[in-house]
Amino acid sequence: MAVQKSRKSRSRRDMRRSHHRMEIAEISVDATTGEKHRRHHMTKDGFYRGRQLFKVSQDA
């Protein structure tokens, strides 16, 4: 197993972890329906980039 030669400081550890933060998902608004959705995902009613891809049933 690898063993470090010298202890890393808190500063070095935190600098390494600086890229590990959580990012907020980007939100877009559909041009056709005006509904908010995640980028590159379709809306809940089946629209993506102005076209309806799926017919969503109202049973659920």
Curated annotation (Swiss-Prot):
Residues passing through the membrane, by range: none
Basic residues compositional bias, start-end: 1-20
UniProt entry tagged with the keyword Amino-acid biosynthesis: no
A single GO BP: translation
Annotated InterPro entries: Ribosomal_bL32 (IPR002677), Ribosomal_bL32_bact (IPR044957), Ribosomal_zn-bd (IPR011332)
Pfam family, any one: Ribosomal_L32p
Disulphide bonds in the chain: none
Keywords for the protein's UniProt record, in alphabetical order: Ribonucleoprotein, Ribosomal protein
Top-rank taxon, per record: Bacteria
Keyword Ribonucleoprotein on entry: yes
Molecular function GO terms recorded: structural constituent of ribosome
Chain spans, region Disordered: 1-22
Cellular component, GO, one term: large ribosomal subunit
Similarity section: Belongs to the bacterial ribosomal protein bL32 family.
Protein name: Large ribosomal subunit protein bL32
Gene: rpmF
